[in-house]
């Protein structure tokens, strides 16, 4: 027989964990190398890199807070979709699908964390949906979560400004599916860096 008690235990803020992790990840051209490696591990045959310097419209978004990610961004697109194990692996810090899929080294897993050297809000599009990570919970996430996902079909109908930012890397306007994966890394601004618990340096795309 056990006596009722109350919950108590240690925890760690996700932002602080990420701050520690990115110290071991490359910056600059090393970030591109990580995505090249991930694309190769996923057996992609194409990788497109696009620098979108535009400030996009932010009037019709699934969450008004997403306006903070509508500025200049680096987009990386390959011609392989996420598998279900990939989607699960990318949600677990410090893991990759290599743990369960043998030779598929780092497939959209560990190497993805290098994104946080660039942005606090990495997002990606695959299998007819857009996913956005939000460790600070100030762009899209709602506690207790640290991110949000939306179906393309619903976005085009009600919040078209959000999927439109992926058009620079090949998403067709109005498309409810995409044959591949597009990552989008909006540059961390000076204002965002000043309040970030992950990295206090703005990211300048050269």
Language-model segments: residues:
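Glycine/threonine-rich ATP-lid/beta-loop region of ATP-binding domains
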Residues: 171-206
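GHKL (Bergerat-fold) ATPase N-terminal catalytic module, capturing the glycine-rich phosphate-binding loop
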Residues: 1-176
């Amino acid at each position: 027989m056990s006596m009722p008690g109350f919950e108590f235990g240690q925890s760690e803020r996700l932002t602080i964990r990420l701050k520690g992790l990115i110290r071991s990840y490359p910056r600059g051209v090393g970030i591109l190398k990580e995505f090249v490696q991930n694309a190769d591990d996923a057996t992609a045959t194409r990788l497109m890199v696009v620098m979108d310097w535009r400030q996009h419209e932010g009037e019709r978004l699934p969450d008004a807070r997403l306006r903070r990610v509508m500025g200049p961004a680096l987009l990386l697109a390959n011609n392989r979709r996420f598998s279900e194990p990939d989607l699960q692996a990318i949600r677990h810090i410090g893991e990759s699908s290599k743990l369960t899929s043998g030779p598929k080294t780092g497939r959209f897993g560990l190497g993805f964390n290098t994104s946080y050297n660039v942005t606090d809000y990495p997002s990606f599009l695959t299998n007819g949906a857009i996913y956005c990570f939000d460790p600070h919970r100030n762009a899209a996430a709602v506690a207790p979560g640290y991110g949000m996902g939306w179906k393309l079909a619903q976005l085009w109908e009600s919040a078209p400004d959000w999927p439109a930012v992926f058009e620079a890397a090949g998403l067709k306007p109005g498309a409810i599916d995409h044959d591949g994966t597009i990552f989008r890394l909006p540059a961390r601004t000076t204002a965002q860096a000043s309040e970030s618990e992950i990295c206090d340096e703005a990211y300048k795309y050269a």
